[in-house]
């Protein structure tokens, strides 16, 4: 279900804006996207895991708010992130 620490560090290294960046919106959205994808695969096999489904919905909401913030502050960074992650927007 959850992504491993090594995978999370790889994602942070790929999407960070500077050397010590771990909290920029790009990094947060990328980590949330990886967690959402992992949880989606879990929920495909465990259809009645409603507790995890609620966690998934909370993650999607958190990602939506971060994307909205990024879109309002810097549209260029928002578009680049959407393209890199392959999100539908």
UniProtKB/Swiss-Prot annotation:
One of its GO terms (cellular component) is cytosolic small ribosomal subunit. InterPro entries: Ribosomal_uS15, Ribosomal_uS15_bac-type, uS15_NS1_RNA-bd_sf. Transmembrane segments: none annotated. Keywords: Ribonucleoprotein, Ribosomal protein, RNA-binding, rRNA-binding. It holds the Pfam family Ribosomal_S15. GO terms for biological process: translation. CDD domains: Ribosomal_S15p_S13e. Belongs to the universal ribosomal protein uS15 family. HAMAP family: Ribosomal_uS15_B (MF_01343_B). PANTHER family: RIBOSOMAL PROTEIN S15, BACTERIAL AND ORGANELLAR, SMALL RIBOSOMAL SUBUNIT PROTEIN US15M. One of the primary rRNA binding proteins, it binds directly to 16S rRNA where it helps nucleate assembly of the platform of the 30S subunit by binding and bridging several RNA helices of the 16S rRNA. This is Small ribosomal subunit protein uS15.
């Amino acid at each position: 279900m959850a992504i491993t620490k090594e995978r999370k560090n790889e994602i942070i290294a790929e999407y960070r804006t500077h050397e010590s960046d771990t909290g920029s919106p790009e990094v947060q959205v990328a980590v949330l996207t990886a967690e959402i994808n992992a949880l989606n695969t879990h929920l495909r096999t465990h259809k009645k895991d409603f507790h995890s489904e609620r966690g998934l919905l909370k993650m999607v909401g958190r990602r939506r708010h971060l994307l909205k913030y990024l879109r309002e502050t810097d549209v260029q960074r928002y578009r680049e992130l959407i393209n890199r992650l392959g999100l539908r927007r």
